[in-house]
Amino acid sequence: MVPVENTEGPSLLNQKGTAVETEGSGSRHPPWARGCGMFTFLSSVTAAVSGLLVGYELGIISGALLQIKTLLALSCHEQEMVVSSLVIGALLASLTGGVLIDRYGRRTAIILSSCLLGLGSLVLILSLSYTVLIVGRIAIGVSISLSSIATCVYIAEIAPQHRRGLLVSLNELMIVIGILSAYISNYAFANVFHGWKYMFGLVIPLGVLQAIAMYFLPPSPRFLVMKGQEGAASKVLGRLRALSDTTEELTVIKSSLKDEYQYSFWDLFRSKDNMRTRIMIGLTLVFFVQITGQPNILFYASTVLKSVGFQSNEAASLASTGVGVVKVISTIPATLLVDHVGSKTFLCIGSSVMAASLVTMGIVNLNIHMNFTHICRSHNSINQSLDESVIYGPGNLSTNNNTLRDHFKGISSHSRSSLMPLRNDVDKRGETTSASLLNAGLSHTEYQIVTDPGDVPAFLKWLSLASLLVYVAAFSIGLGPMPWLVLSEIFPGGIRGRAMALTSSMNWGINLLISLTFLTVTDLIGLPWVCFIYTIMSLASLLFVVMFIPETKGCSLEQISMELAKVNYVKNNICFMSHHQEELVPKQPQKRKPQEQLLECNKLCGRGQSRQLSPET
C-alpha cells in the first residue's frame, strides 16, 4: 500500500500540495493553511538570505581566481584545488547535515552556518597562502551546504500549505541573485589592488546580520513537535498563522511525523513501492545537472571568457556579469510558470537548447585562432613576473620592477641572454608575443599568453559570448531548478528527507569531480572539444528526461506517488513515451453494459477466459 503523501514534510521549489476543503465552507484551504501574514513572509525572507550567501560564494571565485593565481603563481592543479575545496566542504556537510539539523534544529543550523561563513571569509582575507586558502574555502563549503539544507526545510515547515511553493522558491531566486552579485563584485574590484580581499569580505556583514536576525525568529513548529514541545509549537503556529486555535494543524504535523517512521533509509534501495527505481531516477537526474558542465561555467566563467578573447580581468569579469544577469532573468519566469508549463517540458526545452548552444560555442571556438593552447599558469616565479607584465601592463617589465630585477641577479649570464629576445619582440603596444616567450626557452605548458585583442575577430568573440549566455539561460529554466522540484515530488513524505540528502551528496560529489578536472581536461583537449562533450551529455539528458521523467503538471503528490509505485512504471514509460499528465490522474470508472460486467465477472472467476465480447451493433 502506498502511504499518503506528507504535505508537511520538507520540499523544494514549487512543491504541490493537495487542495483541502472544509465542510460547508467552500474554501479551498482550511483556516490554518490560509494564514500567511507578514511575519511568516519576513521569516522566510530572512532565512532565504542564506541562498544569497550561497550564490555569492559559488560565483565569487570566478573573478577572485584571476588575481589569486597570479599573486600565488598557482599551477593548473592548484587552481582546481582552490575552486574544488569549497565543494569538498559542501560534500562533507551534505553527508552529516541532516543529522545536525534534526538534532539541533533548523534555525540553529542556519545561525551556525552564517557564523561559519563569516569566519571562513575572515580567514581568507587576513592571511593569504595556498594552504590557508584551501582551509578557508572548505569551511565556507561546509557553511553553504548546511545552510542550503536547513533553509529549505525551515521555510517549508513555517509556510502555510498553499504558499509553500512560492516561499521555498525564494531560496532559489536568492541563489541566482547572489551569483549576479558576485559577478558584479568581480567586475568592481577587478583592477583594484588586493581586490580579491574585498570580494571575499563583502559577505561577512551580511552573514552576521542574518545570524542576529535568525536568533529572534521562532524555531520550526515541526521541529518543536519532534522534540515533544507541543505547547511551544502551538504558540509558534499562533504567531505564524495569526490564529488562536492551532489544534488542527498540530494534529496534521503529528500525523505526518508518524508516517515518516514507515520507511528506513535502506528502503531507498529496495523494491518496496518501487523505491529503487525512484532513487535511480533521482540520482541520474542530478548526475546530468553536473555532467552537462554548468558548475564549470559558474566557477571558471572569467577564465573561459579570457580564453575566447576578453583579454583583461576587467573585461572578462564584466562579460561574466552578463552570465549572472541571464541566470536571474531566466530563473524568474521558470519559477512562476512551472505549474502551468510543467517541469518535464522545461527540462526538455532546457536540454535541447543547451545542446544547440554548446555545439555552436564549440564550432566558434574552433575558428578562433588563439596565440595559446593552454589556460594553466606556471608556478615558476620567473614566469609569474612575465605573466604579470601581460596582465597588469608592460610597466612591470621596466627597471622599476624589483622582483624581476632580483631574478636577473640570481641567474647566469647565459640564461640571462636567453631572455633578451623578449625585449626585441615587444611590439609597439608593449605586448609580449608568443614567439618571444618561446625564444626565451619557455614551453607552452609553463605560461598563459594573453593574445592581442585584434587576433580574435570581434564577431567570433561576441558570438561565443552569446552562445554561452544562451547555454546559461537554458540551464536556468531546465536542469537548474527543475530537478529539485522533481525530486521533491517523486518520493513519499516519509522518506523524502533522506532521499534528498542522498541525492544532494551525489550532486556535490559529481560537482567535485567536474570542477577538479576542468582546467586539466581543457588543457589536454581544448575548450571546443570540452563543449562538444557537454553537448553529448545534454542530448543524453534530453533522452533520459523523455523516457523516464513523468510529467507531473496538475497532479497531486498522492497521484504521482501512486503512478511511480507501479512495478511496471519504467517499462510503460519506455514503451509509451507520450505519457501526459492525465495518465497520472486516476480516471473515474465508466458505466458498462450488463453484458460487459458479466464477462468481467467471469474472467475474474476463471470461467470466461476464452470468451470474446461480441461487437455491439
UniProtKB/Swiss-Prot annotation:
Q: Which InterPro entries match?
A: MFS_dom, MFS_sugar_transport-like, MFS_Sugar_Transporter, MFS_trans_sf, Sugar/inositol_transpt, Sugar_transporter_CS
What protein is this chain from?
Solute carrier family 2, facilitated glucose transporter member 12
Q: Where is the composition biased (Polar residues)?
A: 8-17
Q: Which gene encodes it?
A: SLC2A12
GO annotation (BP), single: circulatory system development
One Pfam family for this entry, by name? Answer: Sugar_tr
Q: Where in the cell is it found?
A: Cell membrane; Endomembrane system; Cytoplasm, Perinuclear region
Q: Which organism is it from?
A: Homo sapiens (Human)
Per the record, the coiled-coil ranges are none
One cellular-component annotation, GO: perinuclear region of cytoplasm
Q: What does this protein do?
A: Insulin-independent facilitative glucose transporter.
